[in-house]
Structure formats: C-alpha cells, structure tokens
Amino acid sequence: MHRIRLFAGSAALALVAAIPAQAAVPKVTGTVGPGFTIGVKKLAFKPGKTTLTVADKSGIHNFHLIGPGVNVKTSIVGSGTKTFNITLKRGLYRFLCDPHASVMKGSFRVS
C-alpha cells in the first residue's frame, strides 16, 4: 500500500516537473518627473510582447512612446502609474514629454 502511494506521488511530481514554466513577459519601465526628468530603466530590448509601466511623478508631464507599431502616451494632467500592453518590433523607439520635448526625451533600441 505504501509503495502504491509513493509511486502515485512520484508520478504526479514528475508530471508537474515536465510542464514547462511559462516565460515571464519582459517589462519596460518608464518614469517621468519629478522635475524635468524622463527615462527608462534599460535601453536595449528584444522584439516581442511586453508591458510598459510608466510611473508618472509629476502633474505637468506625460510619457509618450513612439516606435515601429507603437504610439502610446500617458495623460499630462495628474500623476500615478499606467500600464500598456505593447509589441516591440526591431528598430528605434523614442520616448518624450510632449509639452517639453526639447529637453525631456530619450530613446532605446529593439534588436
């Protein structure tokens, strides 16, 4: 009886171990504010589905991401966190604050 339980438990454990773990969705993290600052944590990414999470720490700026097939932005009014589901394609992506684009801008590459 103990051997049957041990075998069944071992078989269940082997089955669970054989199921491949789902790969985590890569994340792009952007910030805007405080003051006249804007940025992303990394500057190089691989193509594919991802989430863009923006921490807006100012009520006078927005975070606008533009690139191949992507054009998303947060609101200028208010602050907080906003998340977008996007698909990155190979190429150059620019991020900026629309009202202050001459001084608040940057870019990253997807390759």
Task: Describe each PLM feature range.
Residues 9-18:
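Bacterial N-terminal signal peptides
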Residues 41-59, 83-96:
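Beta-strand cores of secreted/periplasmic/IMS beta-sandwich domains, seen most often
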Residues 24-37, 77-111:
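Extracellular/periplasmic metallocenter environments
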Residues 18-24:
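Bacterial Sec-dependent signal peptides at the C-terminal "C-region" and cleavage site
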Residues 24, 46, 57-61, 102-104:
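Short loop/turn segments at connectors of secondary-structure elements within structured domains
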Residues 62-66:
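Beta-strand signatures of extracellular beta-sandwich domains
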Residues 1-6:
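Positively charged n-region of N-terminal signal peptides that target proteins for export
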Residues 69-75:
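Surface-exposed loop/edge segments in extracytoplasmic proteins
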